[in-house]
Amino acid sequence: MRVLQACAEIFPLLKTGGLADVAGALPPALRALGADVRVLLPGFPPILDGLQNAEEVAKLSPPAALATGGARLLRGHLPACDVDAYVIDAPACYHRSGGPYADAQHQPYAHNHLRL
C-alpha cells in the first residue's frame, strides 16, 4: 500500500501539540506493516531545516503561493522522523514571526484556511 500523509507539523521538527506526536509516529508504524509512506508538509523553517537531499520537483502557482512570492514543491528526507517527505516551500505563507498558526501576539493568521 502507498500512503501520503498530509500534516501541518511533525515531531521532532515542529510541535505545538499532540498532532505532531501522531504525525511523527504514524509513518514508521505504517512502514513496519509494509506500507510505502511519504508525508506532505508545509515549509515552516524548522521543517525545511530538517529536510535533507532536497530537490525541487515542481513550481507551484497561486493559490499555493497566496499570489505572492511563488512556491515550489520539494522532495527530500527527514532523518529526524526517518521518512521521505514532500514540502511546500512558500516563504510568503510559512516564514512568519510567531508560531506556525498565530503571530507574535498570539492572533491566528487570517489566512490559515489557505495556508494549511
Predicted regions and their residues:
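Catalytic cores of nucleotide-sugar-dependent glycosyltransferases that transfer UDP/GDP/TDP-activated
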Residues: 1-116
